Structure formats: structure tokens, C-alpha cells
Amino acid sequence: MSKPSYKVADISLAEWGRKAIIIAENEMPGLMACRKKYGPSKPLKGARITGCLHMTVQTAVLIETLVELGAQVQWSSCNIFSTQDNAAAAIAATGVPVYAWKGETDEEYMWCIEQTLVFPDGQPLNMILDDGGDLTNLVHEKFPQYLKNIKGLSEETTTGVHNLYKMFKEGRLGVPAINVNDSVTKSKFDNLYGCRESLIDGIKRATDVMIAGKVCCVAGYGDVGKGCAQALKGFGGRVIVTEVDPINALQAAMEGYEVTTMEEASKEASIFVTTTGCRDIITSVHLQQMPDDAIVCNIGHFDIEIDVDWLNANAKEKVNVKPQVDRYTMQSGKHIILLAEGRLVNLGCAHGHPSFVMSNSFTNQVLAQIELWTKSDKYAVGVHVLPKILDEEVASLHLEKLGVKLTKLTEKQATYLGVSQTGPFKPDHYRY
């Protein structure tokens, strides 16, 4: 069955998208270094990479890097609200099949992913680049005939990695996978520093709210939660954290945050951010006892953290204030302001993480794709991480842009520490 060569909101936005991509390239030194280092040898030649990851300007730079390295690429977004339509148009205009636009329905979302499985020459995908696991699950559950040709997959985010480990434990994973999320240069940078900037961007664009002085509740204190708590505190918010893990709870307490339950926090906070990657974090009980016009949003991957279905079924009225901002009137007469329908607020209400930090993450993705494509015999079916030396290389590629001058170990110092002068400098279990 024939398919459209692309489907985006408006192809005439391509010129605008190209201007944004050019600016982003200058902020993404890791990806540009990959082009310079690997472009001539085309290590991804023959790879047919199907990607399902937020179709943003930064992702456009990733896609063009994969193409420069020899791959054929097809793309969809991993969230119905996260596409930047100018970026999607710019990539589609280059001939790369893109199926993504901001504001897809759930049915359109799955249709878009399905369009990327078979390439224009009739050949199916042989590599997966995923964010969240929807593409991975679709291939395993609905199109298992393609698994035999797939050399591997790389997964971007915490939620998708949880899915991979669960699949492997249950014997359902059919291909080797690289967990990009747990590269230090991804999780300790994208998850923390990226969210520290993009959360506030999303909340401010959506609501224009003054954060200073307000009580803010952050559900979860992993890397994402840490970044969100820092951001809200930095703007003068009085931050409460909720946690299930005693280690994370202790970390939050020793950073000076109040740590309590959502049952208690929901009575007091004016701004709520869920960051957990788990379901049922803010329930009907919590929503009903929030202060009037409480702002509720999520920065975890899926829309299962806030009980949006209950809100839609039980609120007296729902008013759409503007795209991705809804104000609910509760039975009590109080109001709840929900952002991005409970989906990723930083991408639904803003443009996601800045280019520089995404260069960290996406350089890991490129290296993971090269590893799996060129060294497939090295990787058995299972979930793997990139070697520490590559993690350090990713960090090194981003130092010059920030004016960082790295100290070099002397031979005597290296011998004393028992490491090479060129790394890796830390054991795999080091937590940073």
C-alpha cells in the first residue's frame, strides 16, 4: 500500500525551520563533531533507521547527522504535542519522510509511527531509535516479522528504558538495545539541567504565573525532579517534594526541601509538577483539595501521572484558555489549570530543552546507532549501555564551547590512581 512521502502541518514553514536549525547547529558541538569525524567514512551506510522522538529543531540536527553518516531515516514524533512544525517541514523538504505535526490525535499518532516502518524502496526498517518505547512496542507486538532484520535499538528516556528492562525480564525483547538514558552525559545533563530550564519555560509561556513566594510541589526527586525543584526554588518558589524512595527523599530533605506526601502537599501548593514516570501520582482525591486555580502539569514521558480522565468526567466545566491550557471548574466551585493535557509540559507548552544539552543526549544516540550497526556481533539480545570511554568523549566534545580548560593527569598521577592518562577516569559504578 502506498503512503504519502511525508505528512506535516505546513511544508511552507520549511524556510523558517531551516533558519532555526542553522542556529541550533552552532549550539550542538557534539553532533557537528560526529559529522566531521564520521561523515567521510559513512559508518551508517545501509542502515534504515526508524526514529520516534520529539520532532523538534534539535532533533532535526540529529536526523541530518544520521543522514550525513550514511543512514536512510524516517521519522515520527513520540508525543502528540511535541512537534515543532517548522522543524518537521524543514526536514520533510530535504526528502526525509517525516510524519509529525503538533496536535495529533492518538489515532493519528499511531498512524504516523506506522508510516515509518517501511521505507520508500519497500524495505523495512533495520534499526530503531526510540524515545519512550511506543515504536519498540509497536514493532514487537504488531509487526514482529520485522524483528529478524533489526540489528538493534537505542532508547532515549527513563520511561522507555524501564520498558526495555521489563520486556527483557519477561523474555519479550527481540533485539539488542542500548540504554542511552543511563549514559552519564544524558541522564545527569538532559534530565537535570535540561528540565531545570525547560520546565519554567513551559509554565511561564502557558500561564505567565509569578513563581516567587508560591508553594510548589514536585512529585519525584530523580534527576528530572532535582532539576525541576532547583528551577522553582531559583525563581523563589517554596518547594515541597514527594518521594517513595528513602534515598531520594533524604537527598531532597538535605537540600532544604520539605518532603511530605501528596495528600498533604495537595492542600497547600499552588503549582504541581509530576516527574516520576509512574502512574496515578495526582488522583481525584488530590485534585479536589487543591487551592483555587492550582496549576497542574507533568514532565514525565506519558500522560498517566495525573488523572485527567477523572477531571474530564467530573468537572462542572472545562474552558480552553489557549492551546494546551485548560481551566476546569470543579464541583466545589474551585478551579484547576491543567497544562498540555497532562502530557510533557516543556514540549507541549514550550520548545523543550535547549540545543546545547540535547547535543549531549543526541551525540550518545549517534554513537549508540554506530555501535549497534557496525558491531552487532558484540551485542546479544538484552539491554546494554555505552562504554565509559564514549561517555567521556561526549562530554569532551562539549567543553570548548563553554570555554572549559581540562587539566591533564601526569603519568605519575595516572599511575597512582590506576587509570590511563586519557581515560576512562572513573569506574562504571561511579555515580557522579
Curated annotation (Swiss-Prot):
Record's keyword terms, sorted: Hydrolase, NAD, One-carbon metabolism
- Protein's organism: Drosophila melanogaster (Fruit fly)
User: Is Lipid metabolism included in the keywords of this UniProt record?
Assistant: no
Reactions catalysed, as given in the entry: S-adenosyl-L-homocysteine + H2O = L-homocysteine + adenosine
* Similarity comment: family membership: Belongs to the adenosylhomocysteinase family.
Name recorded for this polypeptide: Adenosylhomocysteinase
Write down any Gene Ontology CC term: cytosol
- Return any one Pfam family short name: AdoHcyase_NAD
GO MF annotation list: adenosylhomocysteinase activity
Q: What happens when the gene is disrupted?
A: RNAi-mediated knockdown results in increased S-adenosyl-homocysteine levels and reduced lifespan.
Cofactor dependence is on: NAD(+)
Return one Gene Ontology term, BP aspect. one-carbon metabolic process
Summarize subunit and interaction data from the UniProt record for this chain.
Interacts with AhcyL1; the interaction may negatively regulate Ahcy catalytic activity.
Query: Which residues of the sequence carry a binding annotation for NAD(+)?
Result: 157-159, 222-227, 243, 248, 299-301, 346, 353, 426-430
In the UniProt record, does the keyword Hydrolase occur? Answer: yes
